[in-house]
Each structure stands twice: as C-alpha cells, then as structure tokens.
Amino acid sequence: MTNYAIILAAGKGTRMTSDLPKVLHKVSGLTMLEHVFRSVKAISPEKSVTVIGHKSEMVRAVLADQSAFVHQTEQLGTGHAVMMAETQLEGLEGHTLVIAGDTPLITGESLKSLIDFHVNHKNVATILTATAQDPFGYGRIVRNKDGEVIKIVEQKDANEYEQQLKEINTGTYVFDNKRLFEALKCITTNNAQGEYYLTDVVAIFRANKEKVGAYILRDFNESLGVNDRVALAIAETVMRQRITQKHMVNGVTFQNPETVYIESDVEIAPDVLIEGNVTLKGRTHIGSGTVLTNGTYIVDSEIGDNCVVTNSMIESSVLAAGVTVGPYAHLRPGTTLDREVHIGNFVEVKGSHIGEKTKAGHLTYIGNAQVGSSVNVGAGTITVNYDGQNKYETVIGDHAFIGSNSTLIAPLEVGDHALTAAGSTISKTVPIDSIAIGRSRQVTKEGYAKRLAHHPSRSK
C-alpha cells in the first residue's frame, strides 16, 4: 500500500488578525503546520505535498526539504487547492490523505486508523467525521437510510433538515489517488461561496456508484480547525493537557498541572517533581529525581539527575547531576555546570563552565569564565568581562577562594588554591597558592564623625 499526503497551508487566516500566516501560529511550541506534519508521518507517506500561498516562503521554511511544495496563487476553495497538487501526484497508484494545516490536535493514531479503515473497506473516498454538540459552521454528513454517506453539505448550502445533523466533516479525507484527480476535473463553483468545494467529489463518486465511507473520530477535540485566536487558545489548552498527562503516565509528578506550561519537544524522566507555574520550552531534557519549584523557567537546556532548581531561569545551559540552582538565579546561554555545583540566590552565569562542587551562593555575576572544581565564590563577586567592545575570559583554578565583593577584571587568571581578599579589585594574574589583596588600607580617624552633618551633636 502506497500512501501520499496533501497538506493545505495556503490560506491567510484573516480572522487571526495577524501578519503571520495562520498555519505558522504556534501551539505548545510548534507551529500548527509542524503538528500536522508530524501526525501525517504516522501513515508513512511516500510523498508529501504542501499547498502554499500567502507568504509562501515563510511557510516553506518551516518544512524545508521534508515536503514538496505547490503554489496556490488564488484561494478559490479546498477543491482548487488540491488541484494544485496534480503536477506532483497525478497518475500515481495509491491512497492520498488530504488534511488542513490548521488542525494541530489531530493525532497520528487517528490518521493511521483512517487509512486502515479506507483500505479495509475498499473505499474510493473516506471522510474523517466527528459528532458535534453544536455543528454550526461545519459541513454536514448526509447519509441514506442504510447509513451510507451520500453527500457533504456546507453550512451555507444546507437545508433545515441538514442543519440539524450532528455528524460533521472534519476536512480530512483519504482518496484513491487517481480517482481524486479525475473527479476534481468535474467540480464547479456553482454554490453559495462561488468556490471549488473538495466535498463535491463525494457526489461525483456516488453518482458513479463508487464506494464512499466515513470514519468517526472518538475525540471531537481532534477535529478542531483553528480560524481565530479563540480556537487557538482552545487548541493550546487541549495540547497542554495531553502533554502533562503523557508525562504523568510516564512517572512525572505535577503538584498543580493546570498551571504548568510544557512544550511538545520537552523530555522529562520518571520521578521528577514539578511544582506549579513552571515553564519548560524548546528542546529541554529533565533528568530523573530532579525537583523544579514554583516559578522556574527553563528553555533549550539539559538538566541532570537529582538537581533542584528553585524559582530560577535557565536558558541554553547544561547541568550535570546533583546541581542546585536558586532561588532567583539566572543561567544564560552557554553555561555548563558540573556535578554538585551550587548556584545560589541572585547569581547570574553566562557563557561559563563551572567545575564540580563549586559554590557561588549569593549576589554574583560570572560571565565568560572557566571556573575549576571546589571553588568558593564569595557574595558580591563580579567578573568584569566587557570593555565596551570586546568580551574577555576569566580563569579560576581548582580550590580557589574568591573573597566577598571581589572584582575580577578580565582577562585574568587566578591559580589553583589561590585566594583573593574580600573587597579586592584584581586585574593581574594570581599565581597558584597565592593571596591577592587589591584594596586600600583602612584609615580610622577617631572623633571625626562629630564634624559631619549627620551626627546628633550637630542638630543642637
């Protein structure tokens, strides 16, 4: 059995009120088009053809070389859109899935079941349908007394009886590929919309006494076509529920799953605990036994086993096992933390590698630095890495002790076991086993405070 796929992605999406093509709006971190394309992969199509139109280059860039593309210059209906794929698929033997690019909730399992139903029943066309409590706006499935599909009627063309029908057309179909393009040559624009309806091929097949079937979705949510921001929000809500449920089934604990935002490509190992209001985005991986507390935000990062991240932001960083971060820490892109590193409250790290068991507990900035293992970085330490034009590196050796309120002016190297005194400004190399003091001596002038305006004796 050879399968093909046509994805309809040419529309502007006027009701979205956006400069962005409709299919490029995101749901849980992926564009709607990407969600659809991933689901389509479940039928293993030999060839996928994406119909593009409005801002076509933007749409093409999302799928790149994963799909063939055809251009629909004028949007003259779904039938017209499918006609555009004729140059890619005409004459080929097999079954062709036609699906809209704005249906992000459709699953690969449902598409596979649709194809199997189509093949097993030897249909020339199979419609994916659903039962709607409120079918207004959808095309209705009209069956005869034997339950056979005889036609699909669009909302604007439906009579009073047809408008009461609850079974609706989801806009997804499977066709015998050759018969599809033969039938498309016979459809017209003689309807309320003045468009080429893809649904008209069903009546053509019926007139030729060819078999048309319908496969009913179990989950109505999968049929959702996103045409405005309201539907986009509904899709986001459903997708978030699916994602958190998947992770819970796989052994992840959520204290308040309704408040968590996790994107589609995030990976979470078993025995992770996630508190409320946590955001996980991009290609993030969370290792087993890790705890993410309330307010944590992580994007495109790898978090090792048994870490604790407390109300902190982590971007494009790698954390080994046993690392603790926060509260209120910020790990910026290019940060790597080895085993059992501790990054405490109000510490910012950027583009740096920090060795195992090193601690930076409070109020510190570490940028463009290579920090060894078992280093203590005192509160208020700053690596001065930027001169207004260029960035420079700071290197701190193993077991060094950086005193509180040290200012390290890069480029700079502090050797193994070296110490910088609290309050120092260090601008020259500190050799191994050395102590560097870069501050003025304290001068105490007894009694001088009485001369100052703030002293109580001055107010008499």
Swiss-Prot record:
UDP-N-acetyl-alpha-D-glucosamine binds at residues 8-11, 22, 72, 77-78, 139, 154, 169, 227, 332, 350, 365, 376. Its main location: cytoplasm. Pfam families: Hexapep, NTP_transferase. Residues 230-250 are annotated as: Linker. One of its GO terms (biological process) is cell wall organization. Residues 1-229 are annotated as: Pyrophosphorylase. Its EC number is 2.7.7.23, 2.3.1.157. Its cofactor is Mg(2+). One of its GO terms (cellular component) is membrane. It is an enzyme of class 2 (transferase). It catalyses: alpha-D-glucosamine 1-phosphate + acetyl-CoA = N-acetyl-alpha-D-glucosamine 1-phosphate + CoA + H(+); N-acetyl-alpha-D-glucosamine 1-phosphate + UTP + H(+) = UDP-N-acetyl-alpha-D-glucosamine + diphosphate. The active site is at 362 (proton acceptor). Catalyzes the last two sequential reactions in the de novo biosynthetic pathway for UDP-N-acetylglucosamine (UDP-GlcNAc). The C-terminal domain catalyzes the transfer of acetyl group from acetyl coenzyme A to glucosamine-1-phosphate (GlcN-1-P) to produce N-acetylglucosamine-1-phosphate (GlcNAc-1-P), which is converted into UDP-GlcNAc by the transfer of uridine 5-monophosphate (from uridine 5-triphosphate), a reaction catalyzed by the N-terminal domain. In the N-terminal section; belongs to the N-acetylglucosamine-1-phosphate uridyltransferase family. In the C-terminal section; belongs to the transferase hexapeptide repeat family. This is Bifunctional protein GlmU. The gene is glmU.
